[in-house]
Amino acid sequence: PVALIDEFQDTSPLQYRLFDRIYRTADNDPHSALLLIGDPKQSIYGFRGADIHSYLRARSATEGRHYVLGTNYRSTKELVHAVNQWFAQAEQRAGEGAFLFQTWKEGVAQNPLPFEPVHARGRTERFVAGEQRVPAITLAWHADEDGGPLASQDLQRHLAQCCAEQIVQWLNDASVGFAEPDGTFDRLRPRDIAILVRTGREATAVRRQLQRRGVASVYLSDKESVFTSSEAQDLLYWLRAVATPLDSRAVRAGLATRLMGLSLEVLAFLAADDEAFDDQSEVLRTLHVVWQRQGVLAMLRQTLHRMGLPARWLSDVGGERRLTNFLHLAELLQNASAELEGEQSLIRWLSTQIQAPGAGTDEQVVRLESDADLVKVVTVHKSKGLEYPVVFLPFSADFRAVERRGTPFVRVPQVDGERELRLDYSDEELAYADRERLREDLRLFYVALTRPRHALWMGWGPLRKGNSKSCVNERSGSGYLLSGDAPIGAAEWRSRLDAFAEATPDLQCLNAPSTVG
């Protein structure tokens, strides 16, 4: 048979063993065909079981049968060249190469995952501010008052402010946009902008700064379950209230949720006025009948109508997200009800999903609230395969090291190429796990740098961890590419960035504002 496997770089060891058993990859059987399509530089789903070492084994087994797509059709020539420079300098340096897979044998380098500069088709339109083209990459540098390193939280807070301020500045400037050769000009809009983050905490930091400046945004995560939302917990209380409308405690709990949005004054009035409370209970009794006769989805739609929720929610910040989550949960509940018997079974199902959201499927991932003109805050994982006109990467200097605390196990390579899970691991094995973390961070950095079409704004600064006063930037993906493993001080980091910018056309390094409004 003929098989075509896309995104092969995200294959797990078990999946590869299955493919290899069927097709015997190394045999190159002329009576069958197995086409493996993937970019190992974008293997970033280790948390889902993907293993780049499986890709590398397949690459070794198919030596001489490799085909490379060497032209970028997404980005401008200037941006592609600048990204090439980031990785080429590390690839050319003596050591392990840009992606930490290069080894040396008798003075000869062997690298199963080399960085190979790509060509660019380029774009006709230019991203401009006034008459000037915006540089392909802008590095915004921030250090403490004395030029020294900052703790992660402090650096994150300031760079989130700088990121939001730059976005506001561009959006408020009518001369910032995309110019075509024929004179056509499209002004920059919020939907043209994506901010890439690694964690929910980073997303919250930058969205808070955008909100303070009146810029609406949406957060898109590859793994955030709708069952972790406040709407899910509130909906659980509401289902209990509708299922037992004669239980005054359940009814009061349902009415007191953020989902219903009743003020403290109204809730106090309902607690003191039996007649008013009975009127609300009657609404729930009616909804209970709808649930029994037409199903949970019909009941929840009636809830929206009878309680006047959409208008109430949409008048507040975040209301569109609340409505989207509510409708998403209603759909999931309706699907689950087809396999469950009775209202209490459905309530128990929802409670279980809330307690264990990690067990969910892609259907449970939070949905985009609308196609409105919003700035997108996206995890790097979620951004893979996508493209955006302008990208912000405000926290590019940060990283999360693998430490003994919080690491219940590590995976250790074996002679046969497999990796063994160890619960009781040595310091050397822990160091290997952190090295693997850095390898994946480098690939995540590559994914982030290759998302924009026109321009990339990066926040950067000297970073310290814990009580140490020393810079640890070399342990991040972006820092390793600039310095290798050598630890250097804050002043030297700035000098290297300046030298890199001077040697790289269309890359500028600027001081981030020390104070941001």
Regions found by a protein language model. Give the residues of each.
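Conserved SF2 helicase motif VI
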Residues: 406-413, 443-452
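Extended acidic/charged loop-beta regions that coordinate divalent cations
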Residues: 497
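Conserved catalytic motifs of ABC-family nucleotide-binding domains
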Residues: 401-435
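Short, solvent-exposed helix-loop connector elements
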Residues: 311-318, 427-441
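Short, conserved clusters of charged catalytic residues that mark active-site
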Residues: 372-375, 440-444
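Key residue(s) within conserved catalytic/signature motifs
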Residues: 2
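Accessory alpha-helical DNA-binding modules that contact the DNA backbone or grooves
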Residues: 273-290
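Conserved motor-region signature of P-loop NTPase helicases/translocases
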Residues: 5-256, 264-268, 289, 295-304, ...
